[in-house]
Amino acid sequence: LGGETAEMAGFYASGDYDVAGFAVGIVDRKNLITGEKITAGDVILGLPSTGIHSNGYSLVRRIISDNHLTLKETYEGFDKPLGEVVLTPTKLYPKLVLPVLKGADVKGLVHITGGGFYDNIPRILPEGTRAVLDADKWPLLPIFSFIKVQGGVEPREMYRTFNCGLGMLLILSRGEAEKAKKILKNIGEAVYEVGTISEGNRDVIVTGGLFHE
């Protein structure tokens, strides 16, 4: 079992309090996806996010405050006001992932939440492997370029803090990855082949994307 309490520095005033909820999941031990079967040559598929999801808001609020940005203004690159962009609801993935689990052998699943790519992916990697991602392989949502420029955030820190356009990663062998792509296409979900597993030391390499800017 695991859990956390969100750190919301500068958000709560004296006398405020937080009401939190939780969910408990159950899985048969034989169906656990532990990542232990991941090997060099496996493929990494990515499912798109809808925005910043539920992580990085303290940094976003600081950038908005420091740059005197207006939540009601529609800035260049957006089709709606900034306030609506940052509050875009978090995408949920169970209805997309469950059909894949039934039709393909998924070796690893990674939810890109707090800690981004660099902290979340190693949790599923076995010893002797490395995840190599090409950020040019998936669309970068405008909000992430906006945050990087307005906040002067280094690319590596962006990929450590935010999902940068991908909310869920699936790791499969080449043949099983093709099955997964077909399943996701049939249910109308976009999916991108964003990287591979190579030999390494349970680390992550990201190239392209925000590193170009």
Q: What are these model-predicted stretches?
A:
Residues 1-58, 196, 209-210:
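Glycine-rich anion-binding loops of enzyme active sites
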Residues 12-17, 71, 76-87, 91-213:
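Glycine-/charge-enriched secondary-structure boundary and capping motifs
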Residues 38-84:
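Acidic, glycine-rich loop-and-beta core segments that form the ion-binding/anion-interacting portion
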